[in-house]
Amino acid sequence: MLCSCRSKSKFLALTLLLLSAATWLYLSVGETEYGPSLGPVAPHFSATSLFQVELESRLREAEEENRRLRQQLGEIRNEEQSPGGGTEGDNSSHCEHRSLTEKCELIHVAIVCAGHNSSRDVVTLVKSILFHRRNPLHLHLITDDVALRVLRNLFNTWMVPSLTISFYNASELKPDVAWIPNKHYSGIFGLLKLTLTKALPSYLSKVIVLDTDITFATDIAELWAIFKKFTGEQVLGLVENQSDWYLGNLWKNHKPWPALGRGFNTGVILLLLDKLRLIGWEEMWRLTAERELMNMLSTSLADQDIFNAVIKSSPTLVYQLPCYWNVQLSDHTRSEQCYSELADLKVIHWNSPHKLRVKNKHVELFRTLYLTFLEYDGSLLRRELIGCPSEGEQQGGSQAALSQLDEEDPCYDFRRESLASHRVHLSFLPHLTPTPDPSDVTLVAQLSMDRLQMLELICRHWEGPMSLALYLSDAEAQQFLRYAQASEVLQSRTNIGYHVIYKEGQLYPVNLLRNVALKNSHTPYVFLSDIDFLPMYGLYENLRKSIAQQDPTGSPKALIVPAFETLRYRLSFPKSKADLLSMLDTGALYTFRYHVWEKGHAPTNYAKWRTATTPYRVEWAPDFEPYVVVRQDCPEYDQRFLGFGWNKVSHIMELDAQEYELLVLPNAFIIHMPHAPSFDISKFRSSEHYRRCVQVLKEEFHQDLSRRYGSAALKYLAAERNQ
């Protein structure tokens, strides 16, 4: 057998040498007859240039064939040097013919994912797979309600080519395993991999199953190709456990579940689903679990204990994968025996409860590899590089609209970025949905990394629910996560929804952010604020009372919260309206933007507010942009407005067009805190082109408003012309 393998290796090496020589000779002939042929192609093609194109194409084909043969040769050499799969303890070399995965063969991967934290972890896993892959992928995600909401929206907005996602309801599978006591930190979800023959479609014959704490360092197609090595009764592909857990010698009186030798780790599994169904897998694992639980009482390592008990009884079911397909970084691991250099690593498994803080002499190397994908820009993975035809690719309306844009349009950048598809990760951190209350109100705001310091301040002023949209890069999202987890103030709050919108383009998509925060509020009313404003103490309860006093059957209302500002970074915050009026009189506070944009808030009628004791009505006026409390189902913000200029004005205009009644609250206020000018406001002030494009967008908005609301909207156009 070994001689046969070496003969095949020599044959492939000879083929590779001859192919390389033929390619070199072919290229040399082309250069001799037609001159240098691989330079840029001229605009006007001659017979010579056509030949150059053909020659270049054939050269690429030859290089691809060369690469494929090199890979196949390398695999055969690896098989000569390393033990093949089989039962535990089999170190003989099996020179089996291993066909490479077909170029466009669809690879199926199943992952159990539940909760907010697991939804973040699975993104890093998927990034590592997508980065290395050369094949189409179909992800089968078994999720709870939280992960379903988060991941469905994330993948819909990510729009990765040649990637299909299917979701399966974990709640429907829980009854199958709920009877099993489990001490593992994964809880009931750690047992659901046992149910995959039932959960996944009957047409699916094989699948790779992964834990969420996995990082790939190679193409997953290499793992998929190992299915072809299964023989006889083998239906499970697993890596041996790399700790002494199942040997029972970790501590005194340690009694693990039964296992074959060291046992096997289930962080990476190859499942032959069709064969498992034929042998009655569901009954097999259930009977085994019932038998062992009579003595063990509960599982310690969730599904892994039951898989190992089954394998102990039926060892012919398992194909042992090489250990580099699951390098385990558990607390008692011996995984360093699996690799001698970085090139040996294929899959890293962070299977310690301590995750990145696990003690391991090579942990810095592994952590660096993990952080590479954690902070990698996921938008780069949208690029189609594998060249496989795709069925049912996501081709949103925005893509069609983008293709219709005129690149000669002076405002092309504004139009293109308003149509950009941003990845959206809802509920980036765990939070609770508020208890239903007809008068409850959520503070809605958006921010970027440079405003992060405002979060703790706002939390001290507003005890109610918040929905915050954060515009971050992948790396900044991790900085925010560390900041939030280290903050006692933020950690003490369970009623704040943080929704990450990943950066794309140069302009700040302010109204997209507002809409994401607005749509993901879970109370009947919302307070549409900005991150630079501190609410008065007690504003949350004040607004709830004001809402309760409104007639819910009348016309829709927008309750205006008067806005003020200070130029002082250190401010003794007013505790009441009387304190605020005193500070207003002494010059410690001002009405908001009175010195640069007075008409933005002048219709609030601050003179009347000073003495008002009941809400009073004001009329809409051009450029009015107050901060308001409205029902959560109010009109969304117009996303054509990016950066600075008219993003709030347009929204108030739409509220007025829908006949919202504007009421100023007499005992409520917010104060704007000073900060350095944003990039967008600096651009607006310095660039005439920027201001001209904002004006163009304003005019188009007026036209759209007239089409939607007819003659009632003509007053806005008239008011604009009279300014």
Curated annotation (Swiss-Prot):
Q: Which GO terms describe its cellular component?
A: Golgi apparatus; Golgi membrane
Q: What is its EC number?
A: 2.4.-.-, 2.4.2.-, 2.4.1.-
Question: Binding positions for Mn(2+) 2?
Answer: 530, 532
Would you say which domain of life the source belongs to? Answer: Eukaryota
Region ranges (Glucuronyltransferase activity): 383-723
Report residues binding Mn(2+) 1: 211, 213
GO MF annotation, one: metal ion binding
The note describing how and how many cofactors are bound reads: Binds 2 Mn(2+) ions per subunit. The xylosyltransferase part binds one Mn(2+) and the beta-1,3-glucuronyltransferase part binds one Mn(2+).
Region (Disordered) residue spans:
73-94
Name a single GO biological process.
Answer: protein O-linked mannosylation
What cofactor does this chain's UniProt record say it requires? Mn(2+)
| Top enzyme category | transferase
Q: What is this protein called?
A: Xylosyl- and glucuronyltransferase LARGE2s
Q: Which gene encodes it?
A: large2-b
Which pairs of positions does the record mark as disulfide bonds? none
The residue ranges for the Lumenal side of the membrane come to 32-723
Outline what the protein does: Bifunctional glycosyltransferase with both alpha-1,3-xylosyltransferase and beta-1,3-glucuronyltransferase activities involved in the maturation of alpha-dystroglycan (DAG1) by glycosylation leading to DAG1 binding to laminin G-like domain-containing extracellular proteins with high affinity and in a phosphorylated-O-mannosyl trisaccharide dependent manner. Elongates the glucuronyl-beta-1,4-xylose-beta disaccharide primer structure by adding repeating units [-3-Xylose-alpha-1,3-GlcA-beta-1-] to produce a heteropolysaccharide. Supports the maturation of DAG1 more effectively than LARGE1.
